[in-house]
A protein has these predicted regions:
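Non-catalytic, topology-defining segments of multipass membrane proteins
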Residues: 1-124, 170-173, 177-190
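Generic preference for well-ordered secondary structure
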Residues: 61, 97, 142, 159-163
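A cytosolic-side transmembrane-helix exit/cap motif
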Residues: 76-81, 152-162
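Hydrophobic transmembrane alpha-helices
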Residues: 104-159, 174-175
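Juxtamembrane transition segments at transmembrane-helix termini in multipass membrane proteins
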Residues: 161-171
């Protein structure tokens, strides 16, 4: 949460980002983080893993690949399942301003669990990441989601997802979008 809000505040303070939905977006993001972060932490208590620099070396690329695969799959499913889109995922697209970084995790609680948290946490257990790798990954994922919703850097792919809704479902390298034909890029003028 610290890395998420530090990055989000950077875009609000330094870049002057504003949204007509800011109070609602911030409230929804805080609700999701406060309600579900403890659930996210429970498995780490019961599932300690050994610390090894060598393990960290191969775990991070595996985590990136698995996160992209899980996020792509669940996110695309939420788009293509009419019930899930209209009752759950549309919530993110309806009130979301893709250029307002603090609202990046504005999501229905069901989506937050099955898309956002699952894609961030499951890879850690699949590769048996140690606590340090898990903390680094969680911080990196938090910064990544905020930057993807900030209208800065090279996040046109995610902004196009919000514009067209049928492209760029993945997070990060968009490997699975490229593999399955849902990758779209065009230069957006900000």
């Amino acid at each position: 949460m610290v890395f998420y809000w530090a990055t989000a505040l950077y875009f609000v303070i330094v870049h002057g980002q504003r949204s007509k939905y800011s109070s609602v977006l911030v409230k929804n993001v805080l609700r999701n983080q406060i309600m579900y972060t403890p659930i996210y932490l429970i498995p780490f208590y019961f599932y300690p893993t050994p610390h090894s620099s060598w393990n960290a070396f191969w775990q991070l690329p595996g985590i990136v690949l698995l996160t992209d695969m899980i996020f792509y799959s669940t996110h695309r499913y939420f788009h293509h399942n009419k019930y899930l889109f209209t009752r759950v995922h549309k919530y993110h697209h309806t009130m979301d301003d893709p250029q307002y970084a603090p609202g990046a995790l504005n999501a229905h609680p069901v989506e937050h669990i099955f898309v956002n948290l699952l894609s961030t946490v499951a890879p850690l257990f699949i590769v048996k990441a140690n606590l340090y790798v898990s903390l680094v990954w969680t911080a990196a994922a938090s910064v990544n989601v905020v930057v993807a919703h900030s209208a800065t850097c090279e996040n046109d792919a995610h902004e196009l997802h919000h514009k067209y809704k049928a492209y760029n479902y993945g997070a990060g390298p968009l490997i699975f979008d490229r593999m399955f034909g849902s990758y779209k890029i065009e230069n957006l003028k900000h």
